[in-house]
């Protein structure tokens, strides 16, 4: 599901959440270790979203596909995961706002995933979480178009890697898949 497809679905159904925020929530819950199917996914979405039950029920097949797509991206051995954000055809200020919404959603989803306050993170993951929180407060001043585009691309790549790092650190071995080893003779 693309950003534009999800945006259209949410607008048609009347959701309060943006596409970026919803994808962030789902990814945060996944990063926190939740694996949800059927009614568990529905109930988790009801708990995390501000939208009405009927809206979630109507959109559940599409939201289930988004959940599976997100999990597949986070577990992909080729690191194919990408935060669902608007494309380059969208003005930079709107992309920055969407990135802030995605990061806030990710943090909210992580908090809703049931992690205890005593969850220990590596220094790298703790720093990544702090950076994600800072990105959630991102603004746009629009000084230099080319420099701003480069900065945005770097932030987007950092966010992608940070989400994978946090997911990988908190995921069970079953989520990551079997380790591959090479035997030298």
Q: Which functions belong to the PLM regions below?
A:
Residues 1-103, 107-185:
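Domain-length accessory/inserted modules outside core catalytic folds
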């Amino acid at each position: 599901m693309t950003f534009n497809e999800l945006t259209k679905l949410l607008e048609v159904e009347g959701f309060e959440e943006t596409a970026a925020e919803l994808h962030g929530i789902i990814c945060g819950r996944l990063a926190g270790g939740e694996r949800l199917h059927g009614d568990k996914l529905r109930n988790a979405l009801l708990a995390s979203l501000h939208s009405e039950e009927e809206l979630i029920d109507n959109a559940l097949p599409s939201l289930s596909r988004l959940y599976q797509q997100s999990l597949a991206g986070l577990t992909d051995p080729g690191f194919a995961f990408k935060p669902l954000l608007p494309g380059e055809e969208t003005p930079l200020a709107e992309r920055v706002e969407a990135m802030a919404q995605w990061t806030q959603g990710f943090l909210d989803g992580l908090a809703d995933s049931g992690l205890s306050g005593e969850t220990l993170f590596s220094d790298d993951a703790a720093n990544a979480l702090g950076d994600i929180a800072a990105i959630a407060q991102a603004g746009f001043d629009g000084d230099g178009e080319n420099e701003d585009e480069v900065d945005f691309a770097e932030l987007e790549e950092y966010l992608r890697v940070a989400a994978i790092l946090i997911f990988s650190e908190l995921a069970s071995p079953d989520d990551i898949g079997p380790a591959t080893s090479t035997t030298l003779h």
